[in-house]
């Protein structure tokens, strides 16, 4: 049973009483990247978001849709910045990613990567258990390109350090892809055209929509 179904179950079972609910559930956040962005800034943002807390936040980036004109370049930029991330502990210097919460969670990440590759995605880097940290719940952050929406990594909440990227042609197509999920927690848009921002803001179906950045609130951590 997925976390969304758990929430629905609680609501059904509590329907006979007068209770107020505030659910902390999962997400499958889409990211739309338009061609007028600063590629270095967006790549750095993606890598920081997906390696901070080892990607274990419910509002994290899950499906990254990149306009096809900049898709190859952004994939390269993300790979470049991902190579600078080291595995380690919070007190280590530099850009460091720690472990996942446990080995079960880590093994699920490896399964998602393996499923994506078998389904046609390309693993650019990562997605392995490092020898130096074999005893912990560490994995190298994974960059997957040419992902499709039918893969598990697109359909399920990732909650870990996997970066799945795929191209799109038009903004209408990207918005349709973004909304193709049972989740609706967070969505993200990177672009500077005012009309496109307005279109994305009106069209994306989520509890919160971030424009040219990411963040969190006490209601949606």
Language model regions located:
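Active-site donor-binding acidic/aromatic loop of nucleotide-activated sugar
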Residues: 164-166
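C-terminal segments
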Residues: 50-52, 117-118, 122, 127, ...
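Conserved glycine-rich beta-strand-loop-beta hairpin in the small C-terminal domain of fold type I
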Residues: 95, 136-139, 156-162, 181-185
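Cytochrome P450 core scaffold surrounding the K-helix E-X-X-R motif
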Residues: 150-155
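Short, conserved phosphate/pyrophosphate- and ester-handling motifs at nucleotide-, phospho-/glycolipid
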Residues: 67, 161, 193
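ALDH superfamily catalytic-core signature
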Residues: 4-148, 171-172, 177, 211, ...
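Flexible low-complexity scaffold tracts in large eukaryotic assembly proteins
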Residues: 1-2, 161
């Amino acid at each position: 049973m997925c976390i969304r179904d758990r929430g629905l179950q609680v609501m059904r079972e509590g329907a006979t009483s007068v209770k107020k609910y505030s659910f902390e559930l999962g997400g499958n956040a889409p990211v739309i990247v338009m061609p007028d962005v600063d590629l270095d800034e967006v790549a750095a943002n993606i890598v920081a978001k997906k390696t901070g807390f080892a990607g274990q936040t419910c509002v994290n980036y899950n499906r990254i849709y990149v306009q096809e004109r900049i898709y190859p370049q952004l994939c390269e930029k993300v790979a470049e910045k991902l190579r600078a991330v080291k595995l380690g502990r919070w007190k280590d210097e530099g850009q460091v990613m720690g472990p996942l919460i446990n080995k079960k969670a880590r093994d699920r990440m490896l399964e998602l990567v393996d499923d994506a590759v078998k389904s046609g995605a390309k693993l650019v880097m990562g997605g392995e258990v490092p020898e130096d940290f074999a005893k912990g719940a560490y994995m190298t952050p994974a960059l997957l390109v040419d992902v499709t929406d039918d893969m598990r990594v697109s359909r399920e909440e990732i909650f870990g350090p996997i970066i799945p990227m795929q191209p799109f042609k038009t903004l209408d197509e990207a918005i349709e892809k973004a909304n193709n999920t049972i989740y609706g927690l967070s969505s993200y848009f990177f672009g500077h055209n005012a009309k496109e921002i307005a279109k994305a803001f009106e069209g994306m179906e989520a509890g919160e929509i971030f424009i040219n950045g990411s963040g969190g609130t006490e209601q949606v951590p």
